[in-house]
């Protein structure tokens, strides 16, 4: 858990900006039953963190 928190804090601004512009898409992912790991992977790929 601490590792995830450190990761989010270090990537906070980019993650916030991405989420703000893609909130509808993330909501659709959640409604369709996407798992935390899938969403994390999609976000990492979208931001080029992978």
From Swiss-Prot:
GO terms for cellular component: extracellular region. Its main location: secreted. It is found in: Secreted. GO terms for biological process: defense response to bacterium; killing of cells of another organism. It comes from the Bacteria. The keyword Iron does not apply. Transmembrane segments: none annotated. Keywords: Antibiotic, Antimicrobial, Bacteriocin, Cytolysis, Formylation, Plasmid, Secreted. Thermostable. Retains virtually all of its activity after incubation at 100 degress Celsius for 3 hours. The keyword Secreted applies. Induction: Mainly expressed during the logarithmic phase. Signal peptide: none annotated. The modification N-formylmethionine is found at residue 1. Has bacteriolytic activity against Gram-positive bacteria B.subtilis, L.lactis and M.luteus and several species from genus Staphylococcus including methicillin-resistant S.aureus, with MIC values ranging from 0.11 uM to 7.8 uM. Has no activity against Gram-negative bacteria or fungi. In vitro, has a dose-dependent cytolytic effect on eukaryotic cells. Highly resistant to proteases. This is Bacteriocin BacSp222.
């Amino acid at each position: 858990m601490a590792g995830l928190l450190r990761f989010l804090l270090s990537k906070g601004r980019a993650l916030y900006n991405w989420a703000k512009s893609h909130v509808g898409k993330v909501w659709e992912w959640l409604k369709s039953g996407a798992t935390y790991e899938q969403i994390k992977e999609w976000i990492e790929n979208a931001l080029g963190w992978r």
